[in-house]
């Protein structure tokens, strides 16, 4: 996702129902338009210096830069043998990779986008992996159901972020963890940090990853641009390039200039 002029306009809607209604339209549109067999990840990319060089299956190689972000975020905690919930799982590529690579006991991917969930259920069929439709601010699970919650590049779309954090706390078992990565306008980082401080989550780590995200976007840029040009009509291509992450777009200038802060966190439930 990108915080672009579109996001700036939507931000004026604040915590209104209009905000969520826009995303309920936008994500299914992108699922239908962006070639569902090609785009299993809708997060931006990530690469370190020197490169991470993860050992990947041949089928995962085209998505290396996207997988890097999932791997680095998720491995802030130990997933092996744990009950995992990913909130806003997109097209399920990250859920599939983490299930295969890190061996959780179970992995549940949740998303508000019905077209995305239908795609996930068709495309990613693995033992212990399931996908359900649901709202990040009203999770359809019992208290203390999960050991780890994963949330990557999604919460900036939630109109009531503190409500999401409260739901994370509710569904985590005592001692459970949140592995999290997202972005905010730099002038909103203080509010972001206050929301974390007011939750029942203890911050274990935090770092800004603008440089790594920009490096990943650069490595993926031509592939992403070609994908948008193939599948979107001309009037949607500007928004599509911002959404998917292409070098030289407004998002990359915001990241380079520091107007956006992309951060990775880990938290534990008190």
Swiss-Prot record:
CDD domains: AdoMet_MTases (cd02440). One of its GO terms (biological process) is methylation. Pfam families: Methyltransf_11. This is Phthiotriol/phenolphthiotriol dimycocerosates methyltransferase. Belongs to the methyltransferase superfamily. Phthiotriol/phenolphthiotriol dimycocerosates methyltransferase family. It comes from the Bacteria. It is an enzyme of class 2 (transferase). Its EC number is 2.1.1.-. One of its GO terms (molecular function) is S-adenosylmethionine-dependent methyltransferase activity. SUPFAM superfamilies: S-adenosyl-L-methionine-dependent methyltransferases. Catalyzes the methylation of the lipid moiety of the intermediate compounds phthiotriol and glycosylated phenolphthiotriol dimycoserosates to form phthiocerol dimycocerosates (DIM A) and glycosylated phenolphthiocerol dimycocerosates (PGL). Keywords: Lipid biosynthesis, Lipid metabolism, Methyltransferase, Transferase.
């Amino acid at each position: 996702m990108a915080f672009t002029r579109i996001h700036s306009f939507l931000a004026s809607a604040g915590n209104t129902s209009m905000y969520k209604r826009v995303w309920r339209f936008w994500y299914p549109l992108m699922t239908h338009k962006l070639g569902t067999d090609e785009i299993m990840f809708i997060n931006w990319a990530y690469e370190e210096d020197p490169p991470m060089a993860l050992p990947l299956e041949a089928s995962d190689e085209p998505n290396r830069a996207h997988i890097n972000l999932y791997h680095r975020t998720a491995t802030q905690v130990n997933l092996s043998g744990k009950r995992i919930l990913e909130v806003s799982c997109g097209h399920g590529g990250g859920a599939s990779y983490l299930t295969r690579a890190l061996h959780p006991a179970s992995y549940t991917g949740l998303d508000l986008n019905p077209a995305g969930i239908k795609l996930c259920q068709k495309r990613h069929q693995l033992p212990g992996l399931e996908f359900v439709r649901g709202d990040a601010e009203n999770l359809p699970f019992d208290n203390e159901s999960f050991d780890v919650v994963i949330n990557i590049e999604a919460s900036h779309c939630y109109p009531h972020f503190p409500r999401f954090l409260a739901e994370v706390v509710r569904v985590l078992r005592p001692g459970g963890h949140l592995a999290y990565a997202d972005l905010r306008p730099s002038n909103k980082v203080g509010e972001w940090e206050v929301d974390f401080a007011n939750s029942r989550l203890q911050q274990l780590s935090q770092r800004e990853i603008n440089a790594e995200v920009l490096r990943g976007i650069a490595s993926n840029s031509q592939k992403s641009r070609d994908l948008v040009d193939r599948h979107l009509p001309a009037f949607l291509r500007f928004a599509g390039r911002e959404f998917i992450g292409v070098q030289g777009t407004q998002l990359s200038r915001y990241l380079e200039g520091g107007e956006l802060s992309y951060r990775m966190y880990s938290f534990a439930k008190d």
